[in-house]
């Protein structure tokens, strides 16, 4: 089963059942014929934004936030970006002071296999591509996402 299908099923189970934690969800997934490692489930939770909310009886229930209004988020993050530049090995994003972490986190949450990861300082984000051969396509992708010329 691919990641998108698995995450769709996770969302469905969390929304339709009172799931208190990862172990319970792992059991529910197994009953559905989906065998997944706990580490993979943790990564899925992080990507999906799954949180544990306290219930009125003092217990916990997993919850998946509604799909964010991606265009609004992109616009807000894009307003924090001053420039996007690259060389042969990496991409640098200059941001308003204090905004690099948010921009880096936004990029980390995108599902682009060509972005290996980001490192953020105060006003600069270093984007590390999966391969140097993808520099121009990753830079174009970032500029498109963040609406930068």
Curated annotation (Swiss-Prot):
Gene Ontology terms describing biological process: L-arginine biosynthetic process; protein complex oligomerization; regulation of arginine biosynthetic process
Gene3D superfamilies (alphabetical): 3.30.1360.40, Winged helix-like DNA-binding domain superfamily/Winged helix DNA-binding domain
InterPro entries membership: Arg_repress, Arg_repress_C, Arg_repress_C_sf, Arg_repress_DNA-bd, WH-like_DNA-bd_sf, WH_DNA-bd_sf
UniProt pathway: Amino-acid biosynthesis; L-arginine biosynthesis [regulation]
GO cellular component, one term: cytoplasm
Domain of life: Bacteria
Record's keyword terms, sorted: Amino-acid biosynthesis, Arginine biosynthesis, Cytoplasm, DNA-binding, Repressor, Transcription, Transcription regulation
Entry's family note: Belongs to the ArgR family.
Protein name: Arginine repressor
């Amino acid at each position: 089963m691919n990641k998108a299908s698995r995450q769709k099923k996770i969302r469905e189970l969390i929304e339709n059942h009172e799931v208190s934690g990862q172990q319970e969800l792992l059991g529910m997934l197994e009953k559905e014929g989906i065998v997944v490692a706990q580490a993979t489930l943790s990564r899925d939770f992080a990507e999906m934004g799954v949180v544990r909310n306290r219930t009125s009886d003092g217990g916990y229930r997993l919850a998946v936030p509604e799909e964010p209004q991606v265009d609004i988020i992109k616009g807000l993050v894009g307003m924090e970006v001053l420039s996007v530049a690259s060389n042969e090995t990496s991409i640098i994003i200059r941001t308003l002071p204090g905004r690099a972490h948010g921009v880096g986190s936004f990029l980390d949450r995108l599902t682009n296999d060509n972005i290996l990861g980001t490192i953020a300082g105060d006003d600069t984000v270093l984007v590390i591509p999966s391969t140097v051969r993808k520099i121009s396509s990753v830079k174009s992708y970032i500029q498109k996402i963040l609406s930068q010329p």
